[in-house]
Each structure stands twice: as C-alpha cells, then as structure tokens.
C-alpha cells in the first residue's frame, strides 16, 4: 500500500499536473491565435463597423454605388503609395520621400506631356524610380539611416518640383485629347482606371509578399537582419529593391493624379508619407518590421478614406478632423499591437 501511494504509476499525483499543463497550453495557444487574428484583421473589422454605422446614419447619401466608387477612386492614389510603403516597413525601413515624389511626378508628367504621351509617362517614372534607387543604395550599400536619407530626398524632390514649376508659380496643364489623360479619366466596366490600376498593384504586391522568395526575404530581413544574413539572404539587393519599388509606385500615383486633373502642381502630396505610414500601420503592419500584409494595408487605406468621406457627409467638420481621427487611430493601433505582441510571447 505505501508503495502505491509514493510511486509514479497510475493513480499517482503526476497525472493532475499533466492535465493542468495541457489545459494551460491549450489556453495559451488559443490566446495566441486570437491575438494573431486581431492583429491581422483588426482594421477590416473597424472598417466594416464604420461602413455599417455610416450607412445607417446617412442612408443613401453614403450607401450608394456612386459614393463607394468615389471612395475607391480617392483611395487608389494613397493605396499605390501605401503598397510600396508596406514592403519598406515590413523590411525594417521607412520612406519619407513618397509625398514629394508624387508631387514631382505630377509636375514632370504635365511638363513632359508637351512632348507627347510617351514622355509624359516615362519621364516621371524614370526620375522617381531613380530617386528610389538612390534611397536604396545609400541605405543598403552606404549603410546610412533610412530616416536621414529619405528625409533628404523628400527635400530634394520637393525642391526639384518647385524648380521645374518656377517656384510653384507655374502650373503645367495636359492638353485635352492626349492618350495619357485616359490613365486618370478613363474607365473599365464603369470603374475608373486609377482604381483598376491600384487593384492590379495590390494583387501583385500580395502575390510578391506571400507567394515569392522575395516576400519571404523582406519579412525575414525586417524581423531579424542578423539572422537573415546568416541564412545567406541578399540583404542589400532586397533593400535596394524595396526603395526602388516605393519610388516607382509614388511616381505612378503622381502620374495618375496629373492625368486625372490634367495638370501638375508642386504643392500636392504634402504629408502623404504620413498618411501612407498611418494606413500601413493601422492595417496591422508592425512599425518595427518583420510582420504585415498587403490586405491589411488595403483595409487601412479604405478606412482612412471612409472616415474622410463620413466627415464630408457631416459637413460641419473641417478637413483637419480627418487628420485628428487618423492620429488617434494610429496611437490606438500601436498600443493594441504592443499588447497583442506581448500576448503572443506569453
């Protein structure tokens, strides 16, 4: 009898401890799973909630096909920039130059249109891609801080846009009838081409991030660059490509803005880099890098533009209210991300 009580066989005291450990493990796993889902889909949940509430409050003024198409069109320009920013932030970087690149692209597109549609398209994309490439080389090869490099190119690109437009006093116009205007004013099946182009870029970005070695490398570098180096990943090449893509997409957004308005102004795009960063982070991408998604960025972009649309529906609120709301959202999201990350580590 004493042997049965003191042994480790059946009926011994070890069994309840093992069961308790299994239960705790299951609870922890469930908590991690819920935290992960909230981190990835939080922006989508908030977006759906805002759309439902706005539809109830404003009725057909908000919940109409025309209004939703307007929201999509307004989202397309920011969305293009945000896709590039998603890769940069997941890769552990930051790009402050995109707003100025958009303005420079719009000015160059309108300026180049006097030489034909081909120049109007090629010139802004080439220049913005070149500046993005310069960002990547200085950051990856010269090992300069991304904040400093892209801040410098922010100033450079904005200054160049003002120089081309005679210190902002000259606004270049695209002549009606040029093929380039179709990029901003044309439509496909009733949907504006900027929306179609942005959708294609989002799809390509999603495939690149989730279905390619390049996307795996970007995530690995942003998560732990030293470990990525030990894995033999081409860190410098991946980083250069990230900033090149960001520059090209900012240039594409500026080109579409110019084609949409048939003009290029050096004053547009101020603060766009902050809106893009906010959309990316609100969409669940960690500002510290290593985790994020294109789908989340899409939800973040749409959420910001839906909020802006709701503010316009109210009519009595200023345009700056959207910036206040975006700032509050950003702080809340970052706090939630920190909490969820801690939950996943427990």
Regions found by a protein language model. Give the residues of each.
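Hydrophobic core segments of alpha-helical transmembrane domains in multi-pass membrane transport
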Residues: 43-56, 85, 157-161, 197-206, ...
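Cytosolic-side transmembrane-helix boundaries in multi-pass membrane proteins
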Residues: 1-53, 203-204, 223, 230-237, ...
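Transmembrane helix-bundle core of multi-pass membrane transporters
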Residues: 142, 146-212, 217, 238-241, ...
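Transmembrane alpha-helical segments in multi-pass inner-membrane proteins
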Residues: 244, 250, 260-327
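Helix-loop-helix "hairpin" substructures at the membrane interface of multi-pass membrane proteins
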Residues: 115-118, 122-124, 130-135, 139, ...
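Short loop segments and helix-boundary regions at transmembrane helix junctions
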Residues: 33-35, 91-94, 130-172, 208-213, ...
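Hydrophobic alpha-helical transmembrane segments
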Residues: 40-45, 71, 78-79, 100-101, ...
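Single transmembrane alpha-helix segments in multi-pass membrane proteins
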Residues: 49-115, 137-144, 280-294, 328
